[in-house]
């Protein structure tokens, strides 16, 4: 389902201009990919990162994507699994761990999530659930822990000339989400985004 490269070529003979044959060469992407990188940022310091992707996890058509980023003042580890599409729906789930120590604020966060994305023409919707635990330690202030179970619904319309390389059109997005004390959250909340 994934391509490493696609090369399209034509015969450049002007005599064939009315009906020129087109040659298409497709190379399938490797089913597994590992990557490594290093860099430096002025606000988080030196970093190294590793990534791994498997486009056919457990030989079931599941896409697996994971990454580890270690910076001097921030670290992150994630793993996501995308199940094969079923009709217009695509389900996914994942886990995330993040830790940071920036400007006197230490944050340690773990999250589990699941989502269903549905595509109908140029309209994409997503319903997502996320369970998150955070430890927050501000310098000179008491630390605290928070727990959140949130639900989020996203509506997105893409009216562009080319989804992969748009040159004209627009994208509209609207999100609504929230959590409740009665359902594992420390606070009742509602949020909107557009």
What are the functions of these language-model segments?
Residues 106, 186-187:
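Generic detection of long, well-ordered alpha-helical segments
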């Amino acid at each position: 389902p994934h391509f490493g490269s696609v090369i399209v070529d034509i015969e450049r003979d002007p005599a064939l201009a009315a009906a020129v044959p087109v040659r298409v060469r497709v190379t399938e992407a490797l089913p597994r990919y590992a990557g490594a990188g290093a860099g430096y940022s002025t606000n988080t310091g030196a970093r190294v990162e590793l990534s791994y992707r498997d486009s056919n996890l457990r030989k079931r058509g599941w896409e697996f994507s994971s990454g580890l980023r270690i910076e001097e003042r921030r670290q992150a580890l994630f793993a996501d699994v995308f199940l094969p599409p079923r009709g217009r729906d695509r389900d996914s789930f994942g886990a995330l761990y993040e830790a940071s120590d920036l400007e006197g604020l230490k944050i340690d966060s773990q999250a589990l999530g699941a989502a269903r994305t549905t595509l109908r023409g140029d309209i994409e919707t997503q319903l997502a659930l996320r369970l998150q635990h955070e430890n927050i330690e501000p310098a000179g202030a008491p630390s605290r822990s928070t727990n959140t179970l949130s639900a989020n619904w996203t509506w997105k319309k893409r009216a562009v000339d080319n989804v992969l390389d748009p040159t004209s059109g627009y994208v509209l997005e609207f999100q609504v989400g929230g959590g409740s004390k009665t359902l594992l959250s420390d606070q009742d909340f509602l949020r909107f985004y557009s």
